[in-house]
């Protein structure tokens, strides 16, 4: 899905999680377009895969796409919009991709939700403004990661209620997604 940028309109590139371009992400793209943003919502899967099972989706993502290909694909989209204000909006692995690209000097901002793998890339120093939102996770100390991130220039990290993957698994009108959409709009309108 792509809406055309006009003038200096901010371009929002939504980077999906391992489940692919879910119905909720399509609805988010429509919502952001109605708010005046140009939106790009690419599928990183060559077959347009949308998965309902997290574990199967995870295996498919890492066997067919992987972080490096995702970085190249999103990097190509960034290059297509040079001169525009560009924001990356990522979920899970998409948040990690947004984080990894936040220091490239080519984007204005990045927003990430439940990007748990960001903890493996704390050496990144963003040149863009970055807002990161984490949910509690069993596999690592989220609060320690948030503290490390908040010590960096241009980064705001926070713990929000919810579970990893809520944007794909909750109803679009749920309080969690409505809260996330408010956070997204606040970041994009800054």
Model-assigned labels for residue ranges:
Residues 43-47, 116, 163:
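Short beta-to-alpha linker loops that shape the active-site pocket of alpha/beta-hydrolase fold enzymes
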Residues 126, 131-134:
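Short beta-strand/loop motif that positions the catalytic acidic residue
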Residues 106-117:
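A conserved short beta-strand
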Residues 136-139, 162-163:
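Acidic beta-to-alpha connecting loop that harbors the catalytic carboxylate
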Residues 89-94, 98:
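Gly/Ala-rich beta-loop-alpha elbow adjacent to hydrolase catalytic centers
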Residues 1-82:
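Serine-hydrolase catalytic machinery in alpha/beta-hydrolase-like enzymes
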Residues 28, 140-149:
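Short alpha-helix in the alpha/beta-hydrolase fold that links the catalytic acid
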Residues 155-190:
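C-terminal catalytic histidine-bearing segment of alpha/beta-hydrolase fold enzymes
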């Amino acid at each position: 899905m792509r809406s055309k940028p006009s003038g200096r309109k901010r371009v929002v590139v939504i980077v999906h999680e391992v489940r692919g371009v879910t119905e909720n992400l399509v609805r988010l793209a429509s919502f952001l377009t109605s708010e005046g943003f140009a939106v790009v919502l690419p599928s990183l899967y060559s077959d347009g895969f949308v998965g309902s099972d997290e574990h199967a989706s995870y295996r498919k993502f890492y066997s067919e796409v992987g972080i490096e290909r995702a970085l190249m694909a999103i990097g190509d989209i960034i290059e297509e919009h040079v001169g525009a204000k560009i924001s990356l909006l990522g979920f899970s692995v998409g948040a990690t991709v947004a984080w990894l690209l936040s220091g490239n000097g080519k984007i204005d901002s990045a927003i990430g939700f439940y990007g748990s793998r960001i903890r493996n890339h704390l050496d990144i120093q963003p040149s863009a403004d970055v807002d990161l939102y984490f949910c509690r996770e069993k596999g690592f100390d989220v609060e320690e990661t948030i503290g490390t991130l908040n010590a960096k220039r241009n980064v705001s990290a926070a713990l929000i209620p919810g579970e990893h993957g809520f944007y794909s698994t909750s109803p679009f009108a749920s309080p969690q997604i409505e809260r996330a959409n408010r956070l997204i709009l606040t970041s994009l309108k800054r």
